[in-house]
Curated annotation (Swiss-Prot):
The chain crosses the membrane at residues 285-305. Residues 410-458 form the LysM domain. It is a single-pass membrane protein. GO terms for cellular component: plasma membrane. Residues 41-57, 177-192, 264-273, 364-411 have a biased composition (Low complexity). This is Probable elastin-binding protein EbpS.
Length: 460
């Protein structure tokens, strides 16, 4: 016999599930894009939920495992999408910062156009104006860098303001360099070397402070733009050698000053952060220790108080127990004394009772002969009285019989099963209770019982 004979209709008609098809679907989902993956996973879940004949035993457990893995995978995909969306938001913020910087740069260019005309007039008057300006501004920058360092928030605001101020100055230098159209290749070579040195220094500084890249993206972007502007200014200064070299020197001095100030600010910020971390870490260690010590001290105090109270209560209980024992002993002693007194009194009473009984016995022994004599006399008197009574009754009966005979009363002898009622019917015509009572009074009967051969007097 096959195993199908032992299956019911449910098992015979249920749908089979092939895990291989599910595996192929998962592989195809991995190959396709994310939208198709979500659609296929939802379809697979809906197919599993819409089955009319769910599997049993091992196949059911396997399907549950597969659905659980699909659900966990969907959750991971959603989490990945959310993280990607957050990263894109951050990139948009960076783009917004770059756009804002570009707008500021355009504004600075417009301002520089207005200043260019005045600068051209200055160039006509004297070519050494740029050098004089560079030498006069350098001590001011040094004095600014040697001032007191503010807090981290103030430093960030200061950086932004200085970066915005440095842009118009670089534009001024650029225009001054382009305005000198006479210098040759010597100015170009010097400007290229200085720009390369500045760029190399900037790369080294960026590599040293790579841990603080997220906080200083705006400053780096400004430096890169300034370096590009410096290169363009150096290339454009092909005609003016002396004046162009002076403008490039001024630009390099300003960049050096800016880089030194940036490095000092970064070092100060790093030191402040490290000191804050040290202080915060030390306080984080101290606070739990102090809290634990306080908690342990409080527990010890309360525990000591509880132990003292417990010991005091024990001593009080012992005192009360001892006092109660003493009181019970006193009561027992008093009761024993009372019992002894009662026993002695009862013994005395018993002795007196025994003496009384002895006296009574002696009295009874003396009174017994007299009592027997009196009893004998009483018996004799009773016998005499009984004899006289019998004589009187006999005489009375005789007299009554004589009277009845004289008066003509009738007599009746009982035969067979006669009774007083039949006798009353026979002589009086009616067997009433009054007639029966007459017969009973005449014969001195107390009951209705009569016997055969008995003679009865029947009154008229």
């Amino acid at each position: 016999m096959s195993n199908n004979n032992f299956k019911d209709d449910f098992e015979k008609n249920r749908q089979s599930i092939n895990p291989d098809e599910h595996q192929t679907e998962l592989k195809e989902d991995d190959k396709t894009n994310e939208n198709k993956k979500e659609a296929d996973s939802q379809n697979s879940l809906s197919n599993n939920s819409n089955q009319q004949f769910p599997p049993r035993n091992a196949q059911r457990r396997k399907r549950r495992r597969e659905t659980a893995t699909n659900q966990s995978k969907q959750q991971d995909d959603k989490h990945q999408k959310n993280s990607d969306a957050k990263t894109t938001e951050g990139s948009l913020d960076d783009r917004y910062d770059e756009a804002q910087l570009q707008q500021q740069h355009d504004k600075s260019q417009q301002q520089n156009k207005t200043e260019k005309q005045s600068q051209d007039n200055r160039m006509k008057d004297g070519k050494d104006a740029a050098i004089v300006n560079g030498t006069s501004e350098s001590p001011e920058h040094k004095s600014k860098s040697t001032q007191n360092r503010p807090g981290p928030k103030a430093q960030q605001q200061k950086r932004k303001s200085e970066s915005t101020q440095s842009k118009p100055s670089t534009n001024k230098d650029k225009k001054a360099a382009t305005g000198a159209g006479i210098a040759g290749a010597a100015g170009v070579a010097g400007a290229a070397e200085t720009s390369k040195r500045h760029h190399n220094k900037k790369d080294k500084q960026d590599s040293k402070h790579s841990n603080h890249e997220n906080d200083e993206k705006s400053v780096k972007n400004d430096d890169q733009k300034q370096s590009k502007k410096g290169k363009k200014a150096a290339v454009g200064a092909g005609a003016a050698a002396g004046v162009g070299a002076a403008g490039v020197a001024h630009h390099n001095n300003q960049n050096k000053h800016h880089n030194e100030e940036k490095n000092s600010n970064q070092n100060n910020q790093y030191n402040d952060q490290s000191e804050g971390k040290k202080k915060g870490g030390f306080m984080k260690i101290l606070l739990p220790l102090i809290a634990a010590i306080l908690i342990l001290g409080a527990i010890a105090i309360f525990g000591g108080m509880a132990l003292n109270n417990h010991n005091d209560s024990k001593s009080d209980d012992q005192k009360i127990a001892n006092q109660s024992k003493k009181d019970s002993d006193k009561k027992d002693g008093a009761q024993s004394e009372d019992n002894k007194d009662k026993k002695s009194d009862s013994n005395k009473d018993k002795k007196s009772d025994s003496d009384k009984n002895a006296d009574d016995d002696s009295d009874n022994s003396s009174s017994n002969p007299n009592a027997t004599s009196t009893n004998n006399n009483d018996n004799v008197a009773n016998n005499n009285s009984n004899y006289t009574n019998q004589n009187q009754q006999d005489n009375a009966n005789q007299n009554s019989n004589n009277q009845q005979a004289t008066q003509g009363q009738q007599s009746h002898t009982v035969y067979g099963q006669e009774n007083l009622y039949r006798i009353a019917i026979q002589y009086y015509g009616e067997g009433t209770q009054a007639n029966v009572d007459k017969i009973k009074r005449a014969n001195g009967l107390s009951s209705n019982n009569i016997h055969n051969g008995q003679t009865l007097v029947i009154p008229q």
